[in-house]
């Protein structure tokens, strides 16, 4: 009747919009468009505030950057540079199909390789940094957050790459490294592989 939901286990509740925003990791506008499409309702072209448009544009760019990074890591895994990473996965009995299905990859030993690749694709430093893929400091300059690691893309329930987990090859520390929280990645709200469970 009220068209609301409530979970007695975790206390989450709301309406259809908040459900999609929580469960699907949609923005309000994405939830609205999804529901309108599903109901066959045509939405008028809306006027966004400048801030809302900038935020939506930034989210879209961060998703693009993460997708490009995941593709790059996968290609690296399949190249001669990624032999150590591929061997790691093969020792754990992961098939080529599993590696492909989960988009597993490898970040090689060069500490600015992904950065140079993303720059060649036209992405700006500030956006690559906002995606959590590089670090910038006065002493070392710009360097990749992940290098010499097997890579596990973290996807939202819509299979969009929102972050990464990496396991180092060798004895370096930290052994495991995850993306920092970003505009599109909230560690507490995402579970690795959930997109595959749907």
PLM features: residue spans?
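Short, basic/aromatic recognition patches
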Residues: 119-147, 196-198
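A residue-level signal for beta-strand positions that form part of recognition/binding surfaces
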Residues: 4, 161, 174
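Short, acidic loop-beta-alpha module within alpha/beta folds
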Residues: 18, 29-30, 83, 87, ...
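Residue-level marker of regulatory loop/turn positions in helix-turn-helix DNA-binding domains and
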Residues: 107, 143-144, 186
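Non-catalytic accessory segments of DNA primases and related replication-initiation nucleases
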Residues: 1-126, 130, 149
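Short acidic-glycine loop/turn motifs at beta-strand connectors
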Residues: 1, 155-158, 172
């Amino acid at each position: 009747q009220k068209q609301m939901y409530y979970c007695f286990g975790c206390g989450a509740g709301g309406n259809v919009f908040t459900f999609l925003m929580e469960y699907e990791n949609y923005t309000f506008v994405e939830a609205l468009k999804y529901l309108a499409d599903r109901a066959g309702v045509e939405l008028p072209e809306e006027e966004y505030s400048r801030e809302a448009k900038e935020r939506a544009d930034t989210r879209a760019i961060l998703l693009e950057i993460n997708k490009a990074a995941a593709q790059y890591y996968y290609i690296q895994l399949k190249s001669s540079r990624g032999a150590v990473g591929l061997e790691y996965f093969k020792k754990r009995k992961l098939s080529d199909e599993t590696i492909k299905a989960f988009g597993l990859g490898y970040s090689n030993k060069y500490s600015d390789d992904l950065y140079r690749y993303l720059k060649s694709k036209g992405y700006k430093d500030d956006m690559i940094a906002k995606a959590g893929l590089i670090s910038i400091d006065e002493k070392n300059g710009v360097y990749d957050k992940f290098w010499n690691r097997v890579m596990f893309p973290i996807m939202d329930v819509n299979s969009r790459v929102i972050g990464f987990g990496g396991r180092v090859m060798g004895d370096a520390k930290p052994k495991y490294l995850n993306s920092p929280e970003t505009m599109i990645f909230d560690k507490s709200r995402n579970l690795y592989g959930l997109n595959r469970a749907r």
